[in-house]
Design a protein with these regions (language model features):
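Bacterial signal peptide processing site
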Residues: 26-28
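Periplasmic-binding protein-like
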Residues: 51, 127-134, 202, 206-235
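C-terminal motif of bacterial Sec signal peptides marking the signal peptidase cleavage site
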Residues: 20-24
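Flexible hinge/capping segments at coil-to-helix
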Residues: 134-151
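Short helices/loops that flank or line small-molecule/ion binding pockets
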Residues: 74-79, 87-88, 92-105, 120, ...
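Ligand-binding cleft/hinge of the Venus flytrap
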Residues: 59, 73-82, 159-180, 209-213
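Extracytoplasmic small-molecule ligand-binding "clamshell" domains
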Residues: 35-109
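A structural signal for short loop-to-beta-strand junctions that line the ligand-binding cleft
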Residues: 45, 68-69, 116-125, 216-221, ...
Length: 235
């Protein structure tokens, strides 16, 4: 089923959204033709997402799941006559759920880089950056200003991977690098002064700055750049 979904997601996105969501399995004409033959075999697309990850996946004022990636998944499912099943998941349980086939894919601002050996990915559909957000009145304007400060990020996130990898030297200057289960709590702690900075995706930073105008600012230099793709079980 996974391979069929990968193939079908590719051509559905190209057709209805002009987003190149290629499968990574193959993009040949032969596979394009075979996707027409297999679409009837798939009835439900089960998408795992983090429901506290705006603007990609979150709960609206009516407690209904919404967000850019969920809208994209819904359009793909609609164009192919599939039922879409959205499963809010604990982010640190995503691998177990994927390997147990409780979900078909992870579609929620999911970074490819550094995870290529762990998942089968579609081709990337978005360029993203990891950034640092601080309070506007913090006086922190660059990476040097983070020395001896407490920085928080989401557990098992791309930002954490960067701070433990390519930017480990920078993280070594922090007083502490903390992790939380979601970014909503991270920004609540930043607003309350419990932490000094949040490391997160660019789009999350922009969302929080827009929703809390004047409260936060983003350091000019990014931690890293990366690509988003849909992740499937390896193999």
């Amino acid at each position: 089923m996974k391979k069929k979904l990968l193939i079908l997601l590719t051509f559905a996105c190209v057709a209805c959204l002009s987003a190149v969501l290629l499968t990574g399995c193959s993009s040949s004409n032969e596979e394009a033709e075979s996707s027409e033959d297999t679409s009837a075999d798939i009835s439900t697309l089960i998408v795992g997402f983090d429901n506290s990850y705006p603007p990609y996946g979150f709960m609206d004022e009516n407690n209904e799941p919404t967000g850019f990636d969920l809208d994209l998944a819904a359009e793909v499912a609609n164009r192919n006559g599939w039922e879409l099943q959205l499963e809010a998941i604990d982010w640190d349980a995503k691998d177990a759920l994927l390997n147990q086939d409780s979900i078909n894919c992870i579609w929620n601002g999911f970074t490819m880089e550094g995870r290529e050996d762990d998942y089968t990915f579609s081709e990337p559909y978005m360029l993203n950056e990891q950034v640092i957000v601080v309070k506007s009145d913090s006086g922190i304007t660059d990476f040097a200003g983070l020395a001896d400060k407490t920085v928080v990020t989401q557990v098992d996130s791309a930002a954490l991977d960067v701070l433990e990898g390519d930017q480990a030297e920078l993280a070594g200057t922090f007083a502490e690098l903390q992790t939380l289960s979601d970014y909503n709590n991270a920004f609540m702690q930043l607003e309350s002064g419990m932490v000094d900075a949040v490391a997160c995706d660019l789009s999350i930073a922009q969302y929080q700055m827009s929703a809390n105008e004047g409260t936060y600012t983003m350091l000019e230099e990014p931690l890293s750049s990366e690509h988003y793709a849909v992740g499937f079980k390896k193999g």
